[in-house]
Amino acid sequence: MENIGKIPLKDEWRNRWAIIKQFILNPVREMAFLQDQFQVSELYTNIAKRDPHLHDPNFPQWLNFGYWKEETTYNGACAALARKLAEVAELKAGDHLLDVGFGFAEQDLLWVRENNVSSIIGLNTTELQVEIAQERVAKAGLSDRIKLQVGSATQIPFPENSFDKLTALECAFHFDTREDFFAEAFRVLQPGGRLAVADCLPRVGREINFWLRVNSKKMCIPFPNQYDRHTYVEKLKKHGFVNIQALSISEYVWPAMVHYFAQISQGISKHDLVIDLQKDNPGLEAWSRNRGWFMAFDDYLLFSAEKPKLN
């Protein structure tokens, strides 16, 4: 189902006024922020440091919006999203996988246990996440199959034709740029190899304008990455990929996030909140009119693409 990108004018201007007020009240801070370079690693380091359970393997450290079609808990929904991406990637025994932007590697642990992936190499630019993820992998006894290191998805430190599969679970919108990542992914995949990406982007019809630029900056999203699903597919084609598929899962992500942020604002831990879209579904528009506007994305898709096989 195609999403409609425009929101009611009164909501649009309410949101714009909220940004304008920030510039009026804190002009020096806001201008300085907009002039800074992208600090994705700093953003996620600060988020991690606020978590009291960071070193406790009994508390999963998922960092995605989740797939809430049947799940009602945050950790369950995040695991469901990882499983959905595994389906799209067609992960199986024998695969040698590169996972970029792996967060705390929860999905890598799941894919080894449930999909029996032979080996996973993970790249992540946030050093604290790499350190904690290595610790969690070691405690799980899987350090021989999951190797994690600091590294960039736009400058992958491996030779061409190195991997059967390549995954990016809800991180590619941060890459500077996503197109550079596409080029690198194509290079390091073996002929016939498969790329699978869970990604957030503007809905079809949303204006790519000044307001989106400001919100993108606040979310550490390089503005060249802000394009809709149709342009996304064209860019994959441009970099040589074939058999491209795009599966929208917005209806099972964003409505749940309306509830998520409402409960978090009440002081409920993400490990304790309960969301049941079967009983209370606010719909996609509830997200797009509010947080989706400020967070600079309101479409969610799973993309898959293949590097052509050799003749």
Language-model features: where?
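Class I SAM-dependent methyltransferase SAM/SAH-binding core
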Residues: L98-Q155
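Class I SAM-dependent transferase core
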Residues: S41-V88
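Short alpha-helix
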Residues: P224-G240
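Conserved Class I S-adenosyl-L-methionine
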Residues: Q245-N311
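Short, glycine-/aromatic-enriched active-site segment of Class I SAM-dependent methyltransferases
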Residues: C200-F223
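N-terminal auxiliary segments of SAM/dcSAM-dependent transferases
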Residues: E2-H53
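A short glycine-rich, Lys/Arg-flanked "PGG" loop and its adjoining helix->strand segment in the class I
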Residues: E179-R194
